[in-house]
Amino acid sequence: MRALNNSYDVVVVGAGPAGSMASYNASKNGAKTLLLEKSQEIGTPVRCAEAVPRLEDFGINPDPSFVRSYIKGGYLIAPNGKQVVVKGGKTDGYVVERKVFDKYLAIRSGQAGTQIAVKSRVTGIEKTDDGYNVFVNYLGDEYIVKTKIVIAADGVESNIAEYAGLKSKKSHKEICSCAEYEMTNVKLLDNEMMEFYFGDICPKGYIWLFPKGDTVNVGIGIIDSKKRAIDYLDEFLTNPLVKGRLDNAVPVEFKVGGDPVGGPIEKTVADNIMVVGDAAGHVSPLTGGGIGLSMSCGLMAGDVAAQSIKAEDHSREFLSAYEKRWKEKYYKPLMKDLKYKTILQKLSDEELNAIADSIPENLEEVDVGKLAVKIVAKAPSLLRHFKELI
């Protein structure tokens, strides 16, 4: 059981949501698939706020073993405390226990036929005439695994895409630094609603409170700041905006990480290789959210990989079907979010307050173009920021 085989149709590197969904779909459609995970336990370390979209859309039952809270919307809170409620439409979802959820996705992949190897570090890949040699340190032993297709799902610090000549590394200005406490004894505005705080308290980012059953994820994401994310987060815990609600809060876990928020990478396919998930920039530049997007793109990559094996064609041209599919569905929304992020980062606290005062207090969805018209009508001085959206 410990030993790896000499060859596979598909090798997926990284057992996060993108990698597990890719390997699941590849195996389900007949490809001999290996899923490699560098950690000794799938799902650790946890690096994010753990919010996911409707799992039913992926054919996944929201099992109580990993679902901690149902989410029906969120509060957008301006520096002056003005609250805008976003509720209904596509805002519902779940907060999950990532340690359990990620492992569930991997188990699902294993049940579809994937071989899984934890504590497996890929030290390099080498192009061959018909695929790649993948160099793996698995539980201390060295292996060379031959494969026809590599799927790089190895996260924001992806090396696999770089080995293959596909640029995936981001500059520090494209990485959102995140810090988060999981805390008990937190009083939320609503136990089924997320809370988002903006302004100078979290430069070029936001602070979040996400309900998680008996606990709450209290976190921050910032970009290119003079201080550490944890410093801003600690200051927020005593901010008047949350006065009386975090006074008795007790941390039970602390997490740090980075989110790629510079938009998707230019090329996600080459001969015998595809890139997916954080490694591909499959993350909203505006919100930093990417679990659902990565799961969806992972399914696409796994499907195309299996088709490629059946067709005995692993060329860039054939694998480009994957890139075409994810770009048709997600590229424009991601680029819009990148534009919105750029605008948001330029706004002062006074301008954020003016925006909150200019839009309805209750929204079913966030249509930025329509909101921009209302904002400028009530606060003409903001036209310089929003003229591209009107």
From Swiss-Prot:
Gene3D superfamilies: D-Amino Acid Oxidase, subunit A, domain 2, FAD/NAD(P)-binding domain
InterPro entries (UniProt xref): DGGGPL_reductase (IPR023590), FAD/NAD-bd_sf (IPR036188), Geranylgeranyl_Rdtase_fam (IPR011777), Geranylgeranyl_reductase (IPR050407), GGR_cat (IPR054715)
Pathway field: Membrane lipid metabolism; glycerophospholipid metabolism
SUPFAM superfamilies per the UniProt record, alphabetical: FAD/NAD(P)-binding domain
Membrane-spanning intervals of the chain: none
One of the Pfam families matching this protein, by short name: GGR_cat
Protein name per UniProt: Digeranylgeranylglycerophospholipid reductase
Native species: Methanococcus maripaludis (strain C5 / ATCC BAA-1333)
